[in-house]
Regions:
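Short acidic, glycine/proline-rich loop/turn micro-motifs
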Residues: 73-74, 154-160, 200-201
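Conserved helix-adjacent loop modules within structured domains
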Residues: 147, 151-170
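A structural signal for short, well-ordered beta-strand segments and their strand-loop junctions
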Residues: 105-106, 143-145, 186-191
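Metal-dependent nuclease catalytic cores that hydrolyze phosphodiester bonds in DNA/RNA
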Residues: 1-143, 150-152, 163
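Metal-dependent nuclease catalytic regions and adjoining charged, substrate-binding loops involved
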Residues: 163-170, 175-255
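Short amphipathic alpha-helical segments and their helix-coil junctions
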Residues: 31-39, 151-159, 219-230
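Structured loops at beta-to-helix junctions and adjacent beta-edge loops in soluble globular domains
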Residues: 63-65, 147, 192, 249
Length: 255
């Protein structure tokens, strides 16, 4: 049965300009749907452990306080698609590890993502997974964290390692190892190149000093917020590199 017999047909112009207009329309419709869905997601009321490695404690404090982001600073559809793509990559890499014989677990017995909660629930973290066994001649269990990167950043991971290429990730790993009690064995950190699908692997031993430093940082943020005190800005000018791309730039520098 032809589809044309199943629906009421209407006549539309078939010019090149008309189709160009439709192409823009569908782009706008999909982008709006993605952004609208994101607005429905419940905002965090706690400090995400993955963010504690950020160099600006004041930004983390703003997020914890539920400060609305500045006008036109919300994530756009393109950025939200990048985030979603990251989740899909994580799912794929997990599957490849299992195919290779690794006993990778990403959920507890209740089907919930592995994670931890400290400071009476004011700080929480959710890990990508735990490798309990596998074909490598090494000790288990070990934390598994998965990221993705473009070509330029991927090369940086390869040449400099996680601690230098992305200190936020390094802090995240140390904190997760500490509070998930996975300190005996290194974390397996994987990064997939979004341009070539090449995968970078790095074993990251537990950094006790870094974990303590980040834990202390969380305490400072919590105590300052409880006392209704704003932590210092990271810079002397709003034109500082980190401030230029901060979602709270206007709020921070106008106060």
């Amino acid at each position: 049965v032809a589809f044309s017999t199943l629906i009421q047909t209407q006549s539309y112009p078939k010019t090149k300009s008309h189709f160009k207009m439709l192409e823009q329309d569908i782009s706008d419709i999909i982008d709006k749907a993605i952004v609208d869905r994101n607005k429905e997601v419940k905002k965090r009321t706690y400090i995400g452990a993955s963010s504690l490695g950020d160099s600006c404690s004041r930004k983390i404090q703003y997020r914890y306080m539920g400060q609305p982001v500045d006008d036109n600073r919300d994530f756009d559809a393109k950025t939200l698609r990048i985030f979603q793509f990251g989740h899909e990559i994580e799912f794929s890499v997990a599957g490849w590890l299992r195919q290779a014989g690794f006993d990778l677990r990403v959920e507890d017995k209740n089907g919930e993502q592995f994670g931890f909660s400290i400071a009476e629930g004011e700080v929480k973290g959710h890990i990508d997974g735990v490798i309990c066994n596998g074909p490598l001649d090494t000790a288990y269990p070990m934390l598994w964290e998965c990221k993705s990167a473009n070509e330029k950043k991927f090369k940086e991971f390869q040449t400099k390692g996680v601690a230098v290429a992305n200190p936020v990730y390094a802090a995240q790993v140390a904190l997760y190892q500490a509070y998930m009690q996975l300190t005996d064995n290194p974390c397996l950190f994987t990064v997939l190149n979004k341009n070539t699908s090449e995968i970078y692997y790095e074993f990251i031993p537990f950094n006790k000093a870094l974990a303590q430093e980040i834990s202390d940082k969380a305490v400072v943020i919590l105590e300052a917020t409880k006392a209704n005190e704003m932590l210092p800005r990271i810079a002397q000018s709003r034109d500082y590199f980190a401030c230029k791309y901060c979602e709270f730039q206007d709020s921070c520098w106008s106060s």
